[in-house]
């Protein structure tokens, strides 16, 4: 509740709330994604795994730059395991492997949501048009490997929704790089 009060009366939030941008939604997605992941770490039940995965997927749908949650989750997981002072090395390793597997499940749930939403958008999008559009727009992208992966994903009907999502991530990365 205290966090909500600070968020609601934050000068940054108040100053930018009149603008229609995705930054406020991204802040909410980042905040909820972090909270639900920490809740999962505290109590790694299947219910918390599901909710953390669902919130992670929604965050990915809110704004492409929230892909930053992936390294954040890895960092939080490592810190969580390393700060368990009552565990020896082999116990920490076991806890890490168990939580890492469940964290991968969280990612899988989130990306299944992303796949299903982007599947709707690519359903009637001709494959050759998607390929040509992606190739043209990303022709100035610095490194070829991510673009090549994206173009390869477009060629498979099942992975085309992921390709469209990754296309957005690459466009954000390209724009941020200048």
Question: Can you annotate each of these PLM segments?
Answer:
Residues 1-9, 13-32, 46-50, 62-69:
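Multi-pass, polyprenyl lipid-linked donor-dependent membrane glycosyltransferases
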Residues 8, 27, 31, 40, ...:
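Generic, well-ordered alpha-helical scaffold segments in large soluble proteins
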Residues 33-48, 83:
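Membrane-interface transmembrane helices that cradle and orient dolichyl/undecaprenyl
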Residues 41-57, 96:
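Short hydrophobic alpha-helices at membrane interfaces in multi-pass membrane enzymes
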Residues 58, 71, 77-94, 98-178:
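Transmembrane-lumen/periplasm boundary regions of multi-pass, lipid-linked membrane glycan transferases
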